[in-house]
Amino acid sequence: MKIGCYLKRLRTVFRQVANQSATAELHFLALGKLLSENSKNKRQIDSLSDVEFKVFSQWGDDGIIQWLVNHIDFPNKTFMEFGVSHYREATTRFLLMNNNWSGFVMDGSAANVEKITNSEYYTNYELIAKAAFIDADNVNSLLLSSNFEKEVGILHIDLDGNDYWIWRKIEVVSPIVVILEYNSVFGIDRPITVPYDKTFDRTNAHFSNLYFGASLSALHQLSAEKGYSFIGCTSSGNNAYFVRNDKLNDVVKKTSLENGYVVSKFREGRDRNGNLTFLTGPERLEAIKGLPVYNINTDQIEKL
C-alpha cells in the first residue's frame, strides 16, 4: 500500500515537472518571437553576433536564422539538419516551431531519433526524423528520401567529422543557406580537413576529441566553388554561414574570411583516460600536432 501511494505521488510530481517544462517552453517561444520581430529592423550589422539569440539552439544560431528569414526570400520553407542528437537543443527547432517550416533531420543514433518521434512537437509540426550514419556514398539518397523540392531553405551539417566531404558530395539539393560546423583549432592558414574515413568517429580518431572536421578556409573554398558566399560565424566560433550568391542583397552581404572568422574558446579536450584537460588557445592545436590532414589545394596528406 505504501509503495502504491509512493508511486502515485511520484507520477504526480512527474506530471507537475512536465507541465512546468511545457510552460517554460511556451515562455521561451514567446520571447523568441519578440526577438525575431526585432531583428526585422536590423538591416545594417557589423557581424552575425549582432543578431544572435538562443531559444533551442546551443549557441546564438536561432537569432541568426531568424535574421536571415526576415531578410531573404525563401520560396520553400524547408530545412535539413544532420547530427541533431535528440533535437532538444538544435539549430532548426525554433525555426520549426516559430515559423512552422517543414524539416528533415537525421542522427546516427536510433535511440535519439526515437526520442524525437515520441515528442509532442513531432505530432504538431511537419518534421521527418531518420536514423542514419551519413557518409559520402549515401548522403544524396538519404536527402532524396525527404521528398523535398531541390531548392531547400536551410541546410545545416554538424557531423563532427566528415563535414567537408559530405558537403562536397551533396548535389541533389540546392539550399539557399548552408550552415557548416568548422574546427577553429585548425586555424585559417591552411584549407585542411581530416582525411575521409567512412566510419570516422571523433572520439575514436583521437582521444583528445579535438581532431575532427575541417578548417574554415577549406569550407570557405568549397562553398565558393559551389556558388556560395561567406557571411560570418557564430560568436562561439563553431558554425559558419554561407548564402547562395543569387540570394545576397543590400542587407545580407558577403564578408571576408579574415573578417568573419571567429576562434572558439571551447575547453573540451580530454586526456587518454577521458578526463577533461581544459586546454585553451594554442594548447589545443599542440595536443593534436602531427596528426594527418588533407590539404584540398595540394591534394596531399600533410601533418598538423
What are these regions (language model features)?
Residues 2-39:
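N-terminal auxiliary segments of SAM/dcSAM-dependent transferases
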Residues 25-73, 80, 142, 190-304:
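Rossmann-like AdoMet/SAM-dependent catalytic core
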Residues 49-157, 184-187, 269-271, 275:
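SAM cofactor-binding core of SAM-dependent methyltransferases
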Residues 81, 105, 156, 177-181, ...:
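A structural signal for short, well-ordered beta-strand segments and their strand-loop junctions
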Residues 98-99, 173-174, 226:
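Short, structured coil segments at secondary-structure junctions
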Residues 116, 143, 166-170, 242:
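Hydrophobic packing residues within well-ordered alpha-helices of enzyme cores
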Residues 126-129, 165-204:
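A short alpha/beta connector and helix-capping loop motif
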Residues 156-166:
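Active-site glycine- and acidic-residue-rich loops that bind
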